[in-house]
Amino acid sequence: MRTDSRRTHNPFNALMVLVIAGVVFFAIYARQTAHEFLFRPPPVSYERDSSFEYVVADDGVELNVFWEGAGKDAWTVLYLCGSEEDLSMAMPKLRNYQLKGYNVASFEYRGYGFTEGAPNESNLYVDAGLVYDYLLRDKGVSESRLVLHGRSVGGGVATELATSRDPARLILESTFTSVYENLLSLKWIPGDMFENENKASKVGCPVLLIHGEDDGIVDAANSIALRESFEGGNVSFLTVPEAGHRNVDRVGGLAYWTAIEQFVRGSKSGL
């Protein structure tokens, strides 16, 4: 009796191959879509002056850093920009912090402004850590009076930094739970980016969440979910009526700055 050596077709195996191929294809698509959504450098619209310095990364890339000191005992804000924001666009907010007596620092991601290279999630984390350590080492900043303020994608950078360093305060403005969940309404696709909700339990400092009620890019539900994820209950939350994704500080005005002052200093005045 001869045995048929041909393999028996297994529909289940074929189905699994199709499913795996579909997941891989969708993961690649999601990654590309997310990258295009996250990183949109604007044209350079300003000239560097003595307020700007360069911090050199390990691979030789010069990070364009802004620093203005207010005094040794002042609180320091390290501002992490949004996806379409260079230092010139962030300057009104930075100047407001200066007027309120803060040391102010920020930097441009790779591919933004006067920083060369191309941005990705990994090098944003590494570069932010370099600037953070530079402030402690070269500017004499104390972590006990250091505030991380991240807007939009910068909130993801600030959250990661707060898990690996020990800042005194964390402010997240217009920030998402994760990129895939916000952009694609999916959490199961592998390779998600800026998974802030999953990192919340690792943040040990007080947190202030700020969100515009009319944000059509990152819905305010993201900040509501983040509030529930931070442990210990040391979380403040400000929603700004009629504010969208990019104008929360302008629409919020006095209420916005009062909330920040109360959160950082315990002061009752935003002026």
Where do the language-model regions lie?
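Membrane-embedded segments
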Residues: 62-134, 156
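Short beta-strand/loop motif that positions the catalytic acidic residue
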Residues: 203-204, 209-211, 215
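Alpha/beta-hydrolase fold nucleophile elbow
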Residues: 140-152
